[in-house]
Regions:
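The feature marks the mature, well-folded catalytic cores of soluble enzymes
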Residues: 1-344
């Protein structure tokens, strides 16, 4: 167990030092649509680098990637980008990246085990990125490789509350035979948290992660929860998400008050090769001064989601990013990114 020393896991809307992307390449599952996914990553890189520093982990040559990006980004954006060459299995920085705590005196870089969402996919290269990257970053490195934890499986309000899902953290392919009580104790100790709120519903059809919180419920300022819900009784997910909504209404803040709930629409089903993909508007990315919202070529629902998210973040520009290529591999924008917070 770690001593607290005033460390905490900041909320994502707090000031960020930089953001990480892990770049797609031809030896990943992106190969059949590499041009399409590269376009999405270029769009993300542009919006990030306009507002904060960007770290790009890349298996391909940094020089060739820099040259390609310079054709699409301005000099000011390119000056904010740092490249780090490293072998990678895939691109999901949210789940293989560092989870970073801050205190008045510095940062703590928590390196957890990433096992491909319960050994579903090869992850040995991605699991080794942080140990290589640590030499280039400021902060105290903390080896937590004996515990499986993905960044997409937790949400923090920055004030001691962690929200997660039981279907993911209690999955037998993660930290078995640890009990729920043991896992909660580990989270509180490692993340310097006072309490952990567990959600038991809301698993998207097609989700490979066993129910990451960042696909269904997100924290926002002023004790606000943004969550997805279905209005279609014929949707196979309708009942599960109705149960999630009921559970959210029962949650209380640390001061005992109900959360402010903002309901996001459920995208119309997106089918690929006969299977439904886990499209969600909850997988947005918070930047300094902006929020990147995944869109799915559904003008009405895309606009509604952006409007609702804008209401939760009135001081930020709301930017839609076409994420139809990303969802082909069962993820979205938040899954592609990992923020490194600034020291207060």
């Amino acid at each position: 167990m770690m001593e607290r020393n005033n460390y905490r896991l900041p909320a994502e809307w707090e000031r960020q030092d930089f953001m990480q992307l892990t770049w797609p390449h031809e030896n990943t599952d992106w190969a059949p649509i590499l041009d399409r996914i590269t376009e999405v990553y270029v769009n993300m890189a542009r919006e990030i680098a306009r507002r904060e520093r960007l770290l790009i982990v890349t298996q391909k040559s940094a020089d060739s990637l820099r040259a390609m990006l310079s054709e699409h980004l301005g000099d000011a954006e390119m000056a904010r980008i740092t490249f780090f060459e490293c072998d990678t299995n895939d691109t999901w920085a949210r789940d293989h990246g560092f989870i970073t705590l801050v205190s008045d005196g510095g940062k703590r870089l928590l390196d957890y085990c990433f096992n491909g969402w319960g050994m579903k996919f090869a992850a040995e290269k991605d699991n080794a990125i942080n140990a290589k990257l640590k030499e280039t970053l400021s902060g105290d490195y903390a080896d937590r490789l004996d515990f499986v934890l993905e960044g997409g499986s937790i949400e923090s309000d920055g004030c001691g509350t962690i929200i997660t899902t039981s279907q993911c953290l209690l999955a037998p392919n993660r930290n078995q035979p640890m009990t729920k009580e043991q896992i909660e104790a580990q989270l509180k100790a490692d993340l310097c948290a006072d309490r952990v709120l567990w959600l038991d519903y809301g698993n998207l059809v097609g989700d490979d992660t066993d129910g990451h919180i960042d696909t269904i419920v997100r924290l926002a300022p002023n004790d606000t929860l943004l969550y997805i819900a279905s209005d279609d009784p014929d949707d196979e997910q309708f009942e599960d998400f109705r149960c999630l909504e009921r559970q959210l209404k029962e949650l209380r803040t640390a001061s005992g008050e109900p959360y402010n709930l903002l309901r996001l629409p459920m995208p119309d089903a997106i089918i690929e090769d006969g299977e439904r993909l886990p499209a969600t508007y909850a997988n947005f990315v918070i930047l300094n001064g902006a929020v990147l919202v995944p869109t799915y070529g559904q003008p009405g629902k895309d606009a509604e989601a952006m409007r609702i998210i804008g209401g939760a973040f009135p001081d930020r520009e709301i930017i839609g990013i076409d994420s139809r290529a990303v969802i082909v591999q069962h993820g979205s924008l938040h899954c592609c990114t990992m923020q490194f917070p600034s020291i207060p």
